[in-house]
Amino acid sequence: VQEADAMQILKRLLIPLAALFAGNALAQMPQGEYLDGKDSKVAVVLAHGQGLDADSHVVSPLRKAIHSELGYHTLSLQMPTIAGNRSPDTFQQYASTFPDAYTRIQAALDFLKNEKGVQRIYLMGYSMGARMTSAFLANHPGSGVVGYIGVGLLAGGPEPLNTNINLRKIRIPVLDIYAENDRDAQFAENRKAMVSDRFVQVPIAGARHDYRGYDQQVAQAVTTWLTKHEAK
């Protein structure tokens, strides 16, 4: 009997400790590039393009602009990548990485809320990162994300790769930025029926899908949209 009592006492001690460690694990910052917004209650989580990294083109200048101009927290995530060239086969294989992508996005939301006291989080994705982030929102309607920013949204492929399908399931405000001189514009044309007070499209004149040389225009579109929504 004494041994059984001892085991019960031990269990009562271990359960709170396990919960404590589990909570701390959830609050750990996922791999990526973070800029601290100090007392700001607003954050933007960013996801890079195919085969790139958390400090690569589009996401790197954008995260820095949001932080410097608006003072928000920014967390650019290292998303799953697949080694090899960017062939159509590789593109299709990325669907297998989406569960991992969802885990990383959720870890970012938990970190910002639990460790940084953030109350309002926007999610941004570029190219493959836009496929991943839009799919996350389509499949996690209760995530608490308050707005979505897509740059270079591509619509090829089946679910969950097709951003146009994903976007039809998203009910939060959306900023759809597309390059006017590339395939982005073709996919954006199919989304014009979604345009409303909630769904805004912004073309970047002269830009191609990599947006090189157009960082300022992309940042201006994003910061203007964020400022408008935070003023409501």
Segments predicted by a language model, with ranges:
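Catalytic histidine neighborhood in serine/cysteine hydrolases
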Residues: 195-210
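Short beta-strand/loop motif that positions the catalytic acidic residue
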Residues: 170, 176-178
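Acidic catalytic loop of the alpha/beta-hydrolase fold
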Residues: 156-157, 180-185
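Serine-hydrolase catalytic machinery in alpha/beta-hydrolase-like enzymes
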Residues: 29-116
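Gly/Ala-rich beta-loop-alpha elbow adjacent to hydrolase catalytic centers
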Residues: 124-133
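Conserved loop-alpha-helix segment in the C-terminal half of the alpha/beta-hydrolase fold
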Residues: 185-199
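Catalytic active-site module of serine/aspartate enzymes centered on a nucleophile-bearing elbow/loop
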Residues: 215-232
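A conserved short beta-strand
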Residues: 142-156
